[in-house]
Amino acid sequence: MTTRPIGISSDPSRAVEVLRNGGLVAIPTETVYGLAADVTMPEAVERIFSTKDRPTGHPLIIHVAHLEIAERWADLSSPTAQILATTCWPGPLTLLAKRRPQVSDIVTGGRPTVGIRVPAHPLTQQLLAEHGGAIAAPSANRFGKVSPTTAQHVIDDIGNHLDPDRDLILDGGPCGVGVESTIIDITTNPAQLLRPGGISAETISELIGDVDEASGPSRAAGMMASHYAPRTKMMLVEPGDPLPDTSSDEVYIIDCAQDLVKAAHDLYSELRAADAAEVSLIIALMPPKEGLGTALRDRLTKAAADQGRGSANQVG
């Protein structure tokens, strides 16, 4: 723990230097901020887990500048992989593929697969291009809590757990999409949707045909039943259900049922604002079960999971 503030910069070259020296860098992406380490430095990768208080068996996602580099770390030779990578990268899509031998067990949690993607944020694209290799990066927050979409969120969550002599926050402004990447397992036939995200399942299906829902044990980031959780109790209200009889000064309402793009962009900031308001209950108006609404429903359901769901007529 430290009282000296962590350094903040908008210079990708400075971030590359930190990574090459074995430090951690909080990076902006189009989805959320990630906490990155050079994938070839196991001690640095281990610090990701301790900084986040993340279980060591929970796999990380590798981020690279382009497909050619991605193929050094994962088997992306299948037609499915090539179609998705060439169409959706850079962008909010993670492919779960067979790992290459040089990928460390600490990155994959000992699994034979690895998640990999090409982020679209311009600052992180510059960082990755200059770095020339690969970085491992989960979200830059304490494990299981609300994801960060601004540099200030990172400071609030893990600023005191970073080393000002070794680490850095790369400030790229607010994240554009606001929810994590879609994860597709391309090792199965048909491919499986492991986590809905910034690219809809409908879009994926248009590209590669049928995509199954996830089955079997958790094998990628974001698959735990409880995740993205605020401190405040949550209640999820489906379209058409009545709101509970609770005075307005005791609740914080998050409307995810209307403009889905805006709802995704604002979701984690709204959950943080609700916690800061110290209300007794967050009421989330649920989006439709399609498009970006599927990702929003996933995040909201997991955010409320450890509190019970209850109907619209009870606090749960």
Predicted regions and their residues:
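Active-site-adjacent structural elements in enzyme catalytic cores
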Residues: 1-316
